[in-house]
Amino acid sequence: MIGLLLFIACDQTTFRTNFDEEEPAILYQAETKTDAPQTAEQLLVINYNIKYGGARLSFFWECDGERYNMTVEEVTGHLDAIAEFITDADPDILILQEVDRSSLRSNYIDQTQYLLDRTNLNYGAYASQHSVDFLPTDGMGHVDFGNAILSKWPISEATRISLPLVESYPAYYKYLYLKRHVLTAKIDLPWNDHFYAIDTHLEAFSEGNTKLDQITKFHSVLTDLSAEGMDWVAAGDLNSLPKGSDNLKDFPDDCPGMFDVDDYSGEEDWIDPLFNDFNSAMNLTEYAADNEAWYSYTGKAEEGWSRTLDYVFTNGTWVNDGADNMVMQSVEQGGYETIYLSDHAPVQAILEVE
């Protein structure tokens, strides 16, 4: 009762959890910049959910997890490994999810700035999807994490566009819960003054129509940019399986009895409009023939990659009709052993410069 009264007594400035429907995102620059190409025939884009630099530590919301926070050495060690991968892969544009900006669990390290200062990328944009001055549960404390876009070229403007919330949650829970969004960043390419990168991270569970509503809004943002004559590449963790998936539930990395197991039954066609209206980095025919080559997530490294959650789309054209696009799962496929860097694998897509 005391806790409830305390919560009621606090107004939204105490926790500062809310966002406008649209608002400017936070812009970044690397401390020391590297020279960016003035011309190019193609752009290498990588989409990557980096799990807030948590690597394969098991947190309390994961299977058999007990951890709440990381030591400085753990966070910087994990981020340094990710930065090494980014430097070696050398993307022109990097689209990230689950990036901490100022969170107790990662020792308040601004991960967007940290990665900019340790890679060949020069500019960044960040938007929060969970910003709470003090989260009074499970030792979380201060939380600020979200999505980020990093680029070799300047980002002149960036916008956070709110996505629909989970309406079924009680008011107090919804108030402190994640506020998902679409992040758009206008990148000033020397040869193109109307190019955008777009980033999103959708609801992990369907929760009624929430995930479907978020997919619809994401599609609408992309459609509007195309109608305005903008060129774009969009990516994110959509927490959805594509049509042609061999398995929709009973994954080897599930934790029955601990958490609700993942079940995507009935959602198979939810992301069809994205595939129908835009160019996907993943060819659905190839995916249907070999699901495993496009797996990009697993909750347990020892079980191997178990499903496809991460995607890249464009209204442009992929180099070689997308033949060089891939999920960078391993040394054999992508050149890097990424399964220990995060619970998601990076997705590579190569965009033709027209």
What are the residue ranges of the model-derived segments?
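Bacterial N-terminal signal peptides
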Residues: 1-7
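N-terminal, active-site-proximal structural segment of metallo-dependent hydrolase catalytic domains
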Residues: 8-144, 354
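Metal-dependent phosphoester-hydrolase catalytic domains
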Residues: 11-33, 209, 222-233, 240-354
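Active-site beta-strand/loop signature of hydrolases that rely on acidic residues for catalysis
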Residues: 43-50, 81-108, 150, 185, ...
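Surface-exposed cleft-lining segments at the edges of enzyme active sites
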Residues: 66-71, 99-101, 165-174, 201-209
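Short helix-loop capping/hinge motifs at secondary-structure junctions, enriched
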Residues: 120, 154-159, 318-321
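Conserved S-adenosyl-L-methionine
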Residues: 123-131, 158-164, 323-329
